[in-house]
Regions:
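Short, small-residue-biased leader/transition segments that mark boundaries at the very start
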Residues: 2-7, 182
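A short acidic (Asp/Glu
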Residues: 25-34, 59-63, 113-118
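A generic secondary-structure signal for well-formed alpha-helical elements
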Residues: 40-41, 77, 109, 113, ...
Length: 182
């Protein structure tokens, strides 16, 4: 409860993307989690969506299908585009993040890392797209002028994401991620 309240107090809006399955023990956990979320302050409800990762990946063709399915989910995309990111330059805030995704899973760091990586990838894609809205800002002009920068940022994003996910997996389970290459 305290953790959820802390996240909501810091980011104002929280969208829970629950990766728990829809059968066996994961269903019981998902229902308990939903009940827990309902008990929080109802004046600022937390949005919730169940995304049964394993069923989706089987139904739509593996990891690439999971990414495509997340892109198609209107409620996930609407929140992602609304929450955005914070962009500051020379002490001036151009964009302010207005929410956060809370990805919930049972015991599979791989599926959590894949879905969070897809959301992060989409946020970076949005960032590059939105640079045009701030074309008069020097930092945006500089970013847009350096044609090698997007490729370098994409590569850095992939490397950092994979390395961080692998490190977290090693800390919590003693083994690296099995899906680190994604």
């Amino acid at each position: 409860r305290q953790r959820q309240m802390c996240i909501r107090d810091r980011y104002q809006r929280v969208f829970v993307l629950d990766l728990l399955g829809t059968r066996d023990v994961e269903t019981l956990l998902a229902h308990a989690y939903i009940d827990h979320l309902r008990e929080l302050d109802e004046t600022r409800p937390i949005k919730y969506y169940n995304f049964d990762f394993h069923n989706v990946s089987r139904a739509v063709g593996g990891m690439e299908g999971v990414g495509a399915e997340l892109d198609r989910l209107h409620n996930v995309q609407t929140q992602r585009q609304y929450y955005r990111y914070t962009l500051c330059t020379q002490g001036k805030m151009l964009e302010r993040q207005s929410g956060v995704f809370r990805v919930n899973c049972f015991d599979c760091l791989d599926r959590t890392n894949v879905v969070e990586g897809l959301l992060s990838h989409a946020a970076l894609r949005d960032f590059f797209h939105e640079l045009r809205r701030h074309a008069q800002e020097p930092v945006c002009v500089q970013l847009a002028a350096d044609t090698s920068l997007p490729a370098a940022l994409w590569q850095a994003h992939r490397d950092l994401w994979a390395g961080n996910g692998d490190a977290l997996s090693n800390i919590s389970t003693g083994t690296g991620l099995s899906l680190i290459h994604i």
